[in-house]
Curated annotation (Swiss-Prot):
Homodimer. InterPro entries: ZIP. This is Zinc transporter ZIP13. It is found in: Golgi apparatus membrane; Cytoplasmic vesicle membrane; Endoplasmic reticulum membrane. It is a multi-pass membrane protein. It comes from the Eukaryota. It comes from Rattus norvegicus. Belongs to the ZIP transporter (TC 2.A.5) family.
């Protein structure tokens, strides 16, 4: 069949042939360069895998293995101090809460807890955060002032965060007014220090019981963050030497044991029995283990300091909220404050703060 005499058809055929040849050539070049690209990608992946394996090998080496074991054991010992109050609080404390004498005993423990929380904030957490702030920016006045202002902002952030959490939990746990009356013995024990003859059935008192439970959980959250910082300190000390690590662990234990007694009293006030309170206290040890693992994995004192700079003041704000909003109002409701700690109403908090001072120094 003869070709089309139209010149336009001939030019279109030439263009189509040219594009086809060009496409085939590009495909051939792409196919030829594909092995080179694959080899480059494989080489890069091998380098990344080798670096990652070297870093993990350094973490799990024989030298680091001793640090891992000592740091985790030290953090676990600090966490086990939360079970110490079982040896101090009598077995019948749960049933005693239903009596006026039990309420008076609990108020004494709460005043001890108040002093522990305030001493922990102003004699331990905030001075340590201040020292870390000065170490990060020494000799630079502008940066030092800015970091000190950030420290105060973190305290406010911790306080407001715990306020928001308590409001959120209370709104989520709203009960139906038609529910059965509450039989929680703590509601009877904390009614101004007097025993209630009948179980509390008023909605307002049920709200008080809910508030007590939430305050206990908030204190557990603050303790978990505090134990995280303790784990950081223990692991960072063992990274320097075993001697410094052991001294740091003993210092933290001396500080934590009386503090845990106050925390145990706060949990009893929240309505938990002795064994449940001990289990919850022991669960906060997970924060210490996580802090120790974080400190060893970073292997950088600077990274630990930057973490501690905001966790310490944030925890301080949480402890201040628990002390001033949840514990102190119960002590202010006491009709005869001289019964809390004769002959001085503020003797127990002051004595607890004095216990914190030598450990902090």
């Amino acid at each position: 069949m003869p070709g089309c005499p139209c010149p336009g058809c001939g030019m279109a055929g030439q263009r189509l042939l040219f594009l086809t040849v060009l496409a085939l050539e590009l495909l051939e070049r792409a196919g030829g360069s594909q092995p080179a690209l694959r080899s480059l990608g494989a080489a890069a992946a091998c380098r990344l895998d080798s670096k990652e394996s070297e870093s993990w090998g350094a973490l799990l080496s024989g030298e680091r293995l001793d640090t891992w074991i000592c740091s985790l054991l030290g953090s676990l010992m600090v966490g086990l101090s939360g079970v110490f109050p079982l040896l101090v609080i009598p077995l019948e404390m749960g049933t005693m809460l239903q009596s006026e004498a039990g309420a008076w005993r609990l108020k004494q423990l709460l005043s001890f807890a108040l002093g522990g929380l305030l001493g922990n904030v102003f004699l331990h957490l905030l001075p340590e955060a201040w020292a870390y702030t000065c170490n990060i920016s020494p000799g630079v006045e502008g940066q030092s002032l800015q970091r000190q202002q950030q420290l105060g902002l973190w305290v406010i952030a911790g306080f407001l965060t715990f306020l928001a959490l308590e409001k959120m939990f209370l709104n989520c746990k709203e009960e139906d007014p038609s529910q059965a009356p509450s039989k929680d013995p703590t509601a009877a024990a904390l009614n101004g220090g007097h025993c209630l003859a009948q179980p509390a059935a008023e909605p307002g008192l049920r709200a008080v019981v809910r508030n007590l439970k939430v305050s206990g959980y908030l204190n557990l959250l603050a303790n978990t963050i505090d134990n995280f910082t303790h784990g950081l300190a223990v692991a960072a000390s063992f990274l320097v030497s075993k001697k410094i690590g052991l001294l740091t662990t003993m210092a933290i234990l001396l500080h934590e044991i009386p503090h845990e007694v106050g925390d145990f009293a706060i949990l009893l006030r929240a309505g938990f029995d002795r064994w449940t309170a001990a289990k919850l206290q022991f669960s906060t040890a997970l924060g210490g283990l996580l802090g120790a693992c974080f400190a060893i994995c970073t292997q950088s004192p600077k990274g630990v300091e930057e973490t501690v700079v905001w966790t310490l003041p944030f925890t301080s704000g949480g402890f201040l909220y628990v002390a001033l909003v949840n514990v102190l109002p119960d002590l202010l409701e006491e009709d005869d404050p001289w019964h809390l700690n004769p002959p001085l109403p503020t003797g127990t908090p002051c004595s607890r703060c004095c216990c914190s001072a030598p450990v902090s120094w």
